[in-house]
Amino acid sequence: MTEAEVGAEDLDTLLDELDYLPGHFHLEMQLNFEPRSPAQLRARDLKLQREGLRQELELVATPQLPAVRHLLGTFSFYLEELGDAREHFLEVARKDPGNLNAWANLAHVYGQLGQEEEEEASAGRLASLMGLEGDPEDAGDPRLRAARCLAEQGYAHGFDVGCASPEERAQVLEAGIALYDKALGYGQQIPIEEKRSWYFTMATLFIRLDGIFLEMGSEEQKRLPAFNRTLALLGEVLKSSDSRHQALAWCYVGMLLERKDTFSTTPMGVHEYGYSGTEPLDCFGKAIEIAKNQPPILNRLAKIFHFLGKQDMAVGTCNMVLAVLTDPELNWQAYCTRAKVRIRAYVHDLERAKVGLGGLPDRNHLACAKADLEEVVKVCPSLRTYLDISQVYYYMGVDAMRELLAVDEAALNQALVFLAKAGELELGDTLPELQLLRGKCLRVQGEDANAAACFKRAVELDDEGSSHTEGFGCLLEALLAQWSQAQLSDGEVGYEVDVWLRHAQGKYPAARLRQELQRVWRGHTEEVLGLARALVAQGRPALVRLLFETMEHEGEDAGGSGKSRVSS
């Protein structure tokens, strides 16, 4: 064995014995695994996640800035923007020469760039900082360096890309929490405010994990220890001098107190940490009080309230922000969140009206949303804003109860204009929701062939495992419309349905696909029966079998339909 081989073997042995390994490119995250989605969709998801992370820079606490920079560099690396990735890691190294992840990540990037000298220098610096080449460098405590390295890695697990199931998302979050726990073991001497920023991120990971467990219907004994620990972590965060952490911690405590009713008995942590007589609304009020006159924090709270379905509270918070800062260029978030609340209110009331649980939705919601979004579009248009205002114009252009009936052609055309502008932006044509909305506009205008092309693209762009089956349902409806108008022959429609049904079966969960077929069946019974006869005649019975299954499930569910409608 040569000297070089012996050295390499010694290094491998040493690395195997380490309790931790710096760098982001070896972490057990979907980001680092072989992509399961096509390159275009993978790039889209990375860029969207990166854009969201950039917005975090406005609010993130100073100790967590290196963690954000490392993630930005990692996303750039996988987007093959190696120069940009290198600059992110170099920026961390310049501000903190003892940052272990910076040197590990730089060594990886330099290796990909073929810059062997820089790669060796970075690896050497890392080895020296870790004490792998004798004594560690004098500057700084090696245990503190290890703690910060692990915390930065734990932070990354909150921004993974490519998880295809709740189980995978849960595993990634659990891994991130474990890294923070290990960081705390190394970091007894970490400054208290920095440690509280770790507690804050851990709490957010725990809350997201609990949400996944709720979604999966996990037993409460599996949720209980983490629930109690999250309350303890938030109790420490409430002692922080950082008003952002204080405000959001109160908001999260309110969220947890609302979730306590999902347990058969009140979790002990509620009593142990002093929340026995505390109402969730009190917590939300304290969060707003702490954040008053601070638009970035208020905007974050408004988004959380919107996500939680507390629409009045979200609008009130947006109004508070706009009273402090009215400029839409500087405060576009408040205008956009308030518009989203209005759109959601309209759609919610519309869905209830369609199943007979309420009157027609108030179209004033659309007028208010339009006014807010137009303020933003004038000064700082974005992909999301274009999509939102297109949705508003779409609903303004169609009859509330008969969506295929146009009531305002000018509004529909304006929706298509904004969708075209969205499509001109970098990621515009990669978003399934853009293709779906464009197809719906065209379908109302009688352009069924063009609409079908949009719906096909929406299905193609959907992630595997997605529950958003509306594009597939709209595609079936467009094909049925073309067939009933003799624009497609029996053979052509049979081929199209067969191909896209198989595509949908490989992409969407079976239960969601069945629900979508039920919706199409109920709305187009005569056409579906005619199509079934045509498919049987052509020797394509797959859809026919699915339709029979749909009818069976619908019959089984009929007795409980009232209950499901109320819950919706």
Swiss-Prot record:
It comes from the Eukaryota. InterPro entries: TPR-like_helical_dom_sf, TPR_rpt, TTC22. TPR repeats lie at residues 66-99, 101-133, 155-190, 203-237, 260-294, 296-328, 432-465. Keywords: Repeat, TPR repeat. The keyword RNA-binding does not apply. Gene3D superfamilies: Tetratricopeptide repeat domain. The keyword Repeat applies. This is Tetratricopeptide repeat protein 22.
